[in-house]
Amino acid sequence: MEYFNVGKIVNTQGLQGEMRVLSVSDFAEERFKKGSQLALFDDKDRFVQEVTIVSHRKQKHFDIIKFKDMYHINAIEKYKGYTLKVSKDNQGDLQEGEFYYHQIIGMAVYEKDVLIGHVKEILQPGANDVWVVKRQGKRDLLLPYIPPVVLNVDVPNKRVDVELMEGLDDED
């Protein structure tokens, strides 16, 4: 089965079995909602077990979650440093114009049919996502995911067409 990374357990939270998660999920509110099914992977990326979320809340930059049948710090302390993943089957459907991060990362980025580079990472600094584009012989390009910049995303062909606004590329 194929799994996709959605977060890392960085610490426990209190004594009642809550965990502090650093999310890398594209849809954290959906991914960590009550009843969601996730998989735990250890620090060597080996599958450990399936888990069900029974509670979720945000606290600063972390998602605080609790798993079914794990209601005390002693039951969860061993999971610090483990990764949470979602199976492909549990990802859910997307609206038109929405994409999973794993679909975008690795895509070729073009401006006027000239290859700029490939998306290597997606950041979530605030109002919109920022795609980090790795370029040959240049510094990475930070590309805001907004309509005037990202013109077309072709998932089947792994291609993104963009129009770089003035000031986006400081190496030109």
Swiss-Prot record:
GO BP term, example: rRNA processing
Disulfide pattern: none
One Pfam family in the UniProt entry: PRC
The UniProt record lists the keyword Chaperone: yes
UniProtKB keywords: Chaperone, Cytoplasm, Ribosome biogenesis, rRNA processing
Subcellular location as annotated: Cytoplasm
Record function comment: An accessory protein needed during the final step in the assembly of 30S ribosomal subunit, possibly for assembly of the head region. Essential for efficient processing of 16S rRNA. May be needed both before and after RbfA during the maturation of 16S rRNA. It has affinity for free ribosomal 30S subunits but not for 70S ribosomes.
Quaternary structure annotation from Swiss-Prot or TrEMBL: Binds ribosomal protein uS19.
Entry domain remark: The PRC barrel domain binds ribosomal protein uS19.
Family listed: Belongs to the RimM family.
Protein name per its UniProtKB record: Ribosome maturation factor RimM
Organism this protein belongs to: Streptococcus pyogenes serotype M2 (strain MGAS10270)
